[in-house]
C-alpha cells in the first residue's frame, strides 16, 4: 500500500503542483488548458457508490439472515454457493448485462421514481415530463442510477458473506434463551441477532462501499460521460474517477497522464480509509463474538 501510494504521489506531483487547491473544487477536466479538477468526478463516484450500497445492503442483510436463521441445511449450502458464484462473475459480464438488458427496464423504473419522488432534488430530471405518455425516455438512460444498480449486484456478495459470517457467530445460548422465553423467529432476529451483528453489518456495508468506489468496467460501459456538478441520479450523464481513467488513459501522456494519476491518488486515499474502517468494524465484531464465547 505504501509503495502504491508513493508511486501515485510521485506521478501526480506535476499536476497537483500546477492545479493547487483548485484541484479539489474544479468540475471541468481540460488538462490541455490547465483547467481540471476532481469535484464532479468525485461527486459522481460517491453517488454511484451510494446508490449501489443503498440497493445492495438491504438485499445482503436479508439474504444473510435467511441463510443463517431460516433456510434448511440443504438450501443453505446452495444459497451460499450461489452468492459465492456471483462474486466470481467478471465485471465485464455485469456491465454487458446492465447495458443490453437491465437498462431497458431501468428507464421505466427511473421514470416511475421521477413521477412520484421528482420533488426531491436527487430524483428530479431536467427536460423530463413524467405526466406525458409520449415523453422520451432517453433522458433516463446511461445514468448514475443504472450504473449504481449494476454495481450493487457486484458488491452484494461481499456484503452478504461478511454479514453471514457475523450472524452465524451469534451465541446459541442467547438465541435459545430468547426462544424459551416465547420469542418468535423475527423477535429473536430483532432482539438478539441484529444488535449482536451491528459491527459486522456496518463493516460489510463499508467493504461493499469500498468496492463500489473503485468499480471501473461496468460503470464505463453504462454511464455517459459528463463533467458537471449535479446530484440528479436518474438523469443521463455523470462520471467517476475510475471511468475517467479508463476512458482517457490510452490517449494521455505527459501532463495529462499526471492529472489522471492525481485523480487516482485521491480515489486510492478515500478507498483506503473506507476499507480500513470497514476492517476495523468487522474485526471488532469478531473479537466481541470470541469474548462472548
Which functions belong to the PLM regions below?
Residues 52-83, 278-287:
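Transmembrane-helix boundary motif in ABC transporter permease subunits
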Residues 81-85, 89, 93, 159-171, ...:
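Transmembrane alpha-helices
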Residues 164-168, 172, 179, 247-253, ...:
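C-terminal transmembrane helix and the adjacent membrane-cytosol boundary/short C-terminal tail
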Residues 18-36, 94-152, 233-235:
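Membrane-interfacial helix termini and adjacent extracytoplasmic/periplasmic loops
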Residues 8-52, 72-73, 131-137, 247-258:
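Periplasmic/extracellular loop-to-transmembrane helix junction in inner-membrane transport proteins
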Residues 43, 47-55, 59, 63, ...:
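Hydrophobic alpha-helical transmembrane segments of multipass integral membrane proteins
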Residues 130-136, 219-268:
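Interhelical loop and adjacent transmembrane-helix boundary motif
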Residues 61-66, 80, 121-130, 135-180, ...:
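Membrane-cytosol interface at the C-terminal ends of specific transmembrane alpha-helices
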